Structures are given as structure tokens and as C-alpha cells.
Amino acid sequence: MEIRMSDSSSKPVLVTCGLPYANGKAHIGHLRTYVPADIFARSLRKEGREVTFVCGSDTHGTPIVVNAEELGITPKELVEIYHKHFDETFKQLGVYFDAFGTTDDPENHNRTLDIVNRLIEKDYVYPKIIEIAYCPACNRFLPDRYVEGACPHCGETARGDECDQGCGKHLEPGELQNPVCTICGGPAEYRHQEHFFFKLSEFGDYLMDYLSNDLGGTTNARNYALGWVKQGLTDWCITRNLEWGVRFPGHEDLVVYVWVDAPIGYIAFTEEWAAQAGDSWEKFWKGEGEIVHFIGGDITYHHCIFWPAMLNGADYSVPTAVVASGMVKIEDKKFSKTRGYVVWVGEDYLDHGFHPDLLRYYLASYTSHTKELNFSWRVLQEKINAELVAVLGNFLYRTMLFAFKNYGEVPEGKLEPEVSAEIEEALKEVKEAMAEYEFKKAVDSAMALASFGNTYFQSHEPWKLIKEDRSACGQVIYNCLHLAKALSLIFEPVLPQTMETAWKGLGQESDIHASRYEEALVPLKAGTKLAKPELLFTKLEDDRIGEMEEIANQRVKAANAKKSAAKGGEKEPSKSEGMGPSEEAKVAEKAAKAEEKVPIETLPQIEYEDFAKLDIRVGKVLFVEPVKKSRKLLRVEVDIGEEKPRQLVAGMASYYTSEELVGKYVVVLANLKPAKLCGVESNGMMLAADDGGAIVAALMPDKEIKPGSRIR
């Protein structure tokens, strides 16, 4: 269950999005955060809430420095290119921020120094001599992505600050095993150097209380963070050996870690907005205003643990809610730029003439915000043709065309109680769904109103009535036009450009984007002139979709060829997306290994009675946390239809993060005798497929089914 948005209309709301990294192009994975956040902000404004919507480009950190060096330009030149790209792309998609800055803006440098100095003054920051990766051949220290090696927790290939290919854990300097320099490919060594640490360990009790009782948003974010806090927190190194970034106070040879100054950008961008609008940034960050962060699920740890601890330590307001999206797949394959499973917003979508609103609709309506979203060109075609064209577009166009041809204006009429009740119910459901960050539910409720409109139009047969009783026909069309007005308002947060066209076609002179939901119940004024309607949505034809599928297939083939070259020892430099050649080769090699044929061992046949002894059920994962002292085990709580959740221990930490499992339906062997693994009792087994070690995939039903359902 998601914790609802506050109903207090008196409090201003700040909505933010996780910052796009200014190191590569916008892809559909980015939009899983930005489009729902824009929908949410638009909807709040329609409810009459005071909303400020800010974001900006994340411009610091080693990936940007590494990529700039490869391209032979400065980091500043690189981030300017991509900052402009993201700004333009968001506007094309109808995502409009009140401020869109960069973390290299003076406001962010100043605010970061203010917060860091405040933490130093309150004794939350201390110096410590630690081991830092150093390359003797390059004669330089190697922070973050300048070094790779084995993750100390799961053994997978990892970067200096994160195990991105394995368990997903944040890594501190010096933790990486068998370090290798990504610049020259040679072995690195560890040398001692003074760095500065934030006393994150002192915030365990505060964070436990905050996450359990105060933080709203989506449960996947809270549960994931609570799992880490329960394990115990370690202090966090907040400095790096780089020239590019925000200087650490009093140390010209150090900058603050990117995950310090990046979230502080939320405050800096609010300051930029306030300076331009003549308003106050303190009402959010020092006052009672609400702060809602929309993020990708992969940065939950930073936003629910590091960030609120820093803010609390520096006496700033903490987030009211964190809304974490589910992951994105492409054509049922795990999203991977290296393997070609990616959809670029510009070259794959906008540049081919697809309307921005169609993609916004897909992202909002495909599934619940916290669940995994699969992008498929065929599914896009099906949804647009069956829903936007056949239902919403059909009702709006046939209503407006009939009214324009036969009346030219809004005819005389009264809003019927049945129609009014349907609109009121839709508004109620949409508002409730938005408050719970359930965008699919909101869209489904709005589409149900469009379906009602089609039924109303069809059942009253105005094409016959116009010949028999023009006045009675006018009454029907008046109500249809009123439904069209209501639908335009309700769908505006999701389809802003298309609904603006419909709004103007209805002769409405006000700004639909500034109009409130409540206007959906204000009677249309008879005599209002109607414009000749435009066809709002057109079918996506097979040949057009086939063309896009072929482009996608060619990309995967090219990636496979590159992967084969990498496996054969040829290293092709990567000039985009922040992935160095060493990393790209390793990821490609791992992907190739996963696709190799695995010999299948055939087991002896058994009688049906043997199979019948197995109590195999469908379970819903409620909670997941890593098992202490283990790199591979997860403690999982599963609802299998019993009075209390069943506790299992699953060896999946190397293949799934906690947030990827929570909410999923899985297959459980329920009558396996209890066993203790690393001191934790497991009362059953979560079933999975294993291809020999490279890939483990949990068995999951292809549709939701009641927990406890038997598998026979």
C-alpha cells in the first residue's frame, strides 16, 4: 500500500525528479521518472495546489571526467552539450520544469558548501586515513569509475563506488578487490590518503523512525531502505580526488562526492526558481512545505538513507515522500545499452514523427508505477489503437464533428444527473489514484468515462434523432460535449498537447493547463462557437511499427557483433553514455557467457504420487532484505495464503535487488523442511531457473493470481 499524498491544500508542494546525468542521451528509462512526475505536478495544480516543479542536470563525478577525456574536451563542454539535450527533449515531451539548472551552477556550489560546513560544525564530518586505489603507470589516484575490480560482497565485477553488475551495494574507497585502472588497464594498488567521512552511522535510529513513520511515497522505496538500516549503517566517504566538482572546504585537492552535491541540487534549483519568481525557497527546505522526490528505483539508497541523514544533520527539512519507479525492459529483455536493448527518445521516437503524448500515455497506463514496465512497439501499437483511437479519440471526434456539422455551436441543453454522476465519480477516482501515485488507475478511471461517453452517444442515436427532434438531439449533444470537456480536463495531465487541441475545438478560451478539475462540472455555455475538429489520434499501422522493430533488431545485431569482438579480445572505445572500454568489454563478455548453451542433465522419471507430495504455491513477495554475513542470500517474506507471511531464505542476492522482488508473484515450495542458512531460518524454497551459474531467474506467473494458489 502506498502512503497517500497529503490532503492539506494549504501546504505548497515541491516536486523533483532524479537528476539526468549529463553524460549521454535521453532514453525511455529516463522517462519512467520524468513523465509520471510531470503528470503528478499537473494533476496537483488541477486540484488547486501550489506546486513548484524543479530538476536539473547532474554534472559532476568521474564518469563525466572519463568521457570528456576520451572525447578530448573539457567536462564543462561535455555537460553543456547534454544539459541542452535534456532540456530540449523534456520540453518536446511536454515536461515543463519551473527551474532546470545544473549541479555546476553557482547556487549549487554555494548551497553544497553551506551544508557541508554545517555538518562539519556539528561534528558530523571527520578526517580519516584510508586506502585509495592508485595507478603507478598513470601516476594518479583512481576514484569511482577510474577503477574496477571484484565486489567484496558478491564477487561480481564492480566500479569503485558501486557494484552495478551484481548486488547493487554502495562501495567505499578501498573496498574493491583486485583493482584495475580503467585508463590503462593495468593493475592498481592501494595507497594511504586522508579523506573525509560523514557519520552516517549516527543516524540509524533517526532513519528507522523517519522511514517507518514519516516518509510517504511508494512502499518499495521505504522497504528497500529499511532493509539496509536494519543491517546497520557505516560512515560514508564524502570526498574524491578530482579536479571537476565542488571543492571540499579547505582542501583544494579534494571535491565532494557526487552523491553529496547532486541531491543538494534540488535545493539549489528551488533557489533559482525562487529568485526568478520572487518567492521563497525556505518554505520547502526550512519550512512546512511538502517535498516529493520522483526517482528511479536504482537510486533509492541515496534518496532514502544518505540524503535525509545529511538534511537532518544540517537542520534542513527532509523529503515528505519518495516515489520510486519500477525498472524498464525492452521487448521483454533487460534494459541494456550495451546489448542494444534500448529506445532512444530522440532518434528512435521523436525523430520518426511519433507524437509525444502517445509515449506519455504508454508510460502512465502500462502498469503500476512501482512495477516493471516493458516497452514493446507492438504493445504500443495495440494500446494506442485500442484505447486512444478506438475509445477516447473516437468519442471526442464523433461528438465534436457531429456538433460542428449540425449546430456549429454548443446547443441548448441541461447536464443530465446520470452524466454529472459519471463525471463526479471519475474525478473522485482520478484524484484518489494520483494521491496514491497510481497513475495507471487514474488513466483507467478516465478511460472508463470515455467508454461511458461512447455508450451514451451510441444508445441515443443522435444521427437518427437529428431528423426527428432537433431540440432533443441538441440535449444529447450538449451532454456529449460536456463529457468531452470533462475528458479534456481529466486527461490533460497525461496528454497535455492533444487535450489542448480538443479544448480549443470545444470553443474554450481559457488555458486548459491552468484550469482546475472542478471546471469539469461547470455547465457549458450554450451558443459557444465550435471549431472544425481535428482527428486527435490516428492508428499506428503495421508497416510503421515493423520499421521500428527492424531498427531495434539491427541495433541488437550490432551490439552482438561488438560483444563478439570484445569477447575475442578486441576493445572498441565507447564514446558515449559514460561507459569506458574496459567496462563495456566486461559487461559484453558477461552477457555472451549468459547466452551460451548449457548442457541439460536429464533426471530419472518419477511417479505422479511423488510430484503430488510437493506443496507448490504462488506467493506474493512482501519484504526483502540482505542476510548479514552473506553475499548471496536474501531474507524474503512471502504471502502464500496463510495467516502470516512465510519467511524464506533465497540465494538470489547476486541476481536481484530487494526492490526488484518486492511486489512480485513467485513460486514457492511450501512443505520443504525448515533449514537455517547463515543463522536465518528458511521455511520453504523460492523456485528459480539456473542455467549453470551465469543467470538465475525466479519463476514468476505471467499474471497476478491469488497468493496461495496451488500449482498442479
From Swiss-Prot:
Domain tRNA-binding: 610-712
Keyword flag Ligase: yes
UniProt xrefs under Gene3D superfamilies: HUPs, Isoleucyl-tRNA Synthetase, Domain 1, Methionyl-tRNA synthetase, Zn-domain, Nucleic acid-binding proteins
Localization per Swiss-Prot or TrEMBL: Cytoplasm
Recorded catalytic activity of this chain's protein: tRNA(Met) + L-methionine + ATP = L-methionyl-tRNA(Met) + AMP + diphosphate
Short motif ('HIGH' region): ranges: 20-30
Domain of life: Archaea
Protein name per UniProt: Methionine--tRNA ligase
Gene: metG
